[in-house]
Amino acid sequence: MKLLNIALDGPAAAGKSTIAKLLAAKLSMIYVDTGAMYRAITYKYLQQNKPEDFDQLIETTELSLTYDKDKGQRVILDNQDVTDYLRENDVTNHVSYVASKEAVRTFSVNKQQELAAKKGIVMDGRDIGTVVLPDADLKVYMIASVEERAVRRQKDNEERGIVSNVEQLKQEIADRDQYDMNRDISPLKKADDAITVDTTGKSIEIVTQEILALVHKIS
């Protein structure tokens, strides 16, 4: 199979990361979790007591992704592995705000494009098909109902030992959608040439097979 770049976009908790990891494994490609980059910068932002100067924050930031056979992708921020801190509630609640800043976005997109330059990448996020990889070989826009996404997020939280309420999560997800779709820089939107895949009520295996079928059509 020829080397491809695959872009998966969509709102929070639509299943992008889970599916992207599986696709990459099945296709012997590299998975790049772009959300982890923004979460890492958000983690630093919180550790530094929410500075307002994002240009300075980025100037002092070193960020890289490494790949461990057993642990998968690891995020190295300023020479420290911060992967295990990136799903904390405080990071989740601030990541949209931090990711909307131009300095943060420019820094992260440049990193992502460098990673994709050699192809063979499955990348998920909110602006991959529109901004990061506009020439991706396959663009998929994943959606799911707010209700289902809230249940998924609660399940993820439970697995991490975090107590959460579905109704509250529904509101947070709906608010996040509005923020992401209406921000000035790299808003969440479907690329004109992206294929929509609705994951509502579907198992991980079924969604993965649907997207694999799309890959095989172009490879």
Swiss-Prot record:
**Which enzyme type, at the first EC level?**
transferase
- CDD domains from the xrefs? CMPK (cd02020)
Molecular function (GO) terms for this protein are:
ATP binding; CMP kinase activity; dCMP kinase activity
Q: Which named protein is this?
A: Cytidylate kinase
Q: Does the keyword ATP-binding apply?
A: yes
Q: Name one GO biological process term.
A: nucleobase-containing small molecule interconversion
Query: Which family does the record assign?
Result: Belongs to the cytidylate kinase family. Type 1 subfamily.
GO cellular component terms listed in the entry, alphabetical order: cytosol
Presence of the UniProt keyword ATP-binding in the record:
yes
What SUPFAM superfamilies does this protein's entry cite?
P-loop containing nucleoside triphosphate hydrolases
Keywords, comma-separated and alphabetical? ATP-binding, Cytoplasm, Kinase, Nucleotide-binding, Transferase
The EC number on file is 2.7.4.25
Subcellular localization: Cytoplasm
Reactions catalysed according to its record: CMP + ATP = CDP + ADP; dCMP + ATP = dCDP + ADP
Its gene name is cmk
Binding site residues for ATP: G10, P11, A12, A13, A14, G15, K16, S17, T18
